[in-house]
Amino acid sequence: MGSMSVWHWVIVAVVVMLLFGRGKVSELMGDVAKGIKAFKKGMADDETQPNTATSVPPVGPNDPVRTLPHQGAPGTAPQPPHVQPHVSAGDHKAV
């Protein structure tokens, strides 16, 4: 009772054919086939075009070590160093 037999699938197929008609089912299957072909073509195109932006050049044992400058968290601007203002004795104003 848990699995469907061949006769169940035959009845389902006949009901689908009666509801949608032979033309609609064949049109739907053609659209599915076109979608699969387009997907496979897209996958083949991705495999033939290596992503050069993320590729890392090989490093030999005698190559110098390159370091990247430290950057803050994304979206934050670097803060300028805090400098104490210099106030001379003659610059005081009464508030």
From Swiss-Prot:
Signal peptide as annotated in the record: none
InterPro entries, A to Z: TatA/B/E (IPR003369), TatA/E (IPR006312)
Localization terms from the record: Cell inner membrane
Alphabetical keyword list: Cell inner membrane, Cell membrane, Membrane, Protein transport, Translocation, Transmembrane, Transmembrane helix, Transport
Gene3D superfamilies with a match to the protein in the record: 1.20.5.3310
A GO MF term: protein transmembrane transporter activity
Any one GO CC term of the record: TAT protein transport complex
Ranges for region Disordered: 42-95
PANTHER family: SEC-INDEPENDENT PROTEIN TRANSLOCASE PROTEIN TATA (PTHR42982:SF1)
Quaternary structure (record): The Tat system comprises two distinct complexes: a TatABC complex, containing multiple copies of TatA, TatB and TatC subunits, and a separate TatA complex, containing only TatA subunits. Substrates initially bind to the TatABC complex, which probably triggers association of the separate TatA complex to form the active translocon.
Family: Belongs to the TatA/E family.
This protein's name: Sec-independent protein translocase protein TatA
Organism: Methylorubrum extorquens (strain CM4 / NCIMB 13688)
